[in-house]
Amino acid sequence: NILIVEGNDPKNNEFFVKAAKASCSQNLKNLILKLEPNSKIEIINPARDDETKTALENIKKYHGIIFTGGAMRLNDMTEEIKKHISFASNCFKHENKILAICWGLQVCSVAAGGKVAPGKKGAHVGIASDIEINEEGKKNLIYKNKKIKFTSPAFNYDEVCEIPPGATLLSSDKVNNVMGLYFTSGNSKIWGLQYHPDYEYWQMINLSSARKDRILKNNVFNNEDEFQNHLNFIKEEEKKLDFENRT
């Protein structure tokens, strides 16, 4: 039994379904079923109080919990975002194994006492190049038999700027120091990834193209030509993508 925690609000879910052909949670569910066809998977959204209540009442039946990516920004700290953090905190009270991806990593880090802020060195738009596993990462089960340096789908403007107490940094790249993280909080073990092994590059290209105006407005690229060259770079990387080494 696996519980998937959706990281988007309904409006952003619609956007992801249109651009990436699935919500974050459904996309992840599809991948898990591809890897383990007999998996039993439930999806909840922390914004819906009835769903979180039921999930917490039945928390012991899950073998693992996955917090997905999402388009919200932690420091906006809306009531909905507070519910995501609260749900993570409540999960930590129980013996859980948790995988937290992108937005999920940021939510779980804050819930465990860490801090999140806009990335000092910019953003990942569709791709993270040359993520490097450090010595601690080489010893962690999440990076067992993986390449030491790899490139992966990624999309984030914010980063974990202060890791939770006792957390272990596992990997970094030139944009974000925290790309892979392991920590315990309460009774739970949490593995966090700032990138997206759950997505493919064509989805990142579609999401980037659909957000082009916002990306250019935020000055992530100097002009539209630079943005287009970046998408072309992702298309080239798509040809090299090795599924086994996305994480």
Kindly give the residue locations of the regions a language model identified.
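Amide-donor transfer/coupling interface in amidating biosynthetic enzymes
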Residues: 1-17, 27-29, 133-247
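Short, glycine/charged-enriched secondary-structure capping and boundary segments
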Residues: 17-20, 79-83, 112-116, 167-168, ...
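Short, flexible loop segments at the rims of nucleotide/cofactor-binding pockets, characterized by
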Residues: 41-46, 75-78, 128-132, 147-149, ...
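Conserved beta-strand termini and adjacent loop/short-helix elements that scaffold enzyme active sites
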Residues: 44-47, 119, 155, 172
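Cysteine-nucleophile active-site neighborhood
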Residues: 62, 70-137
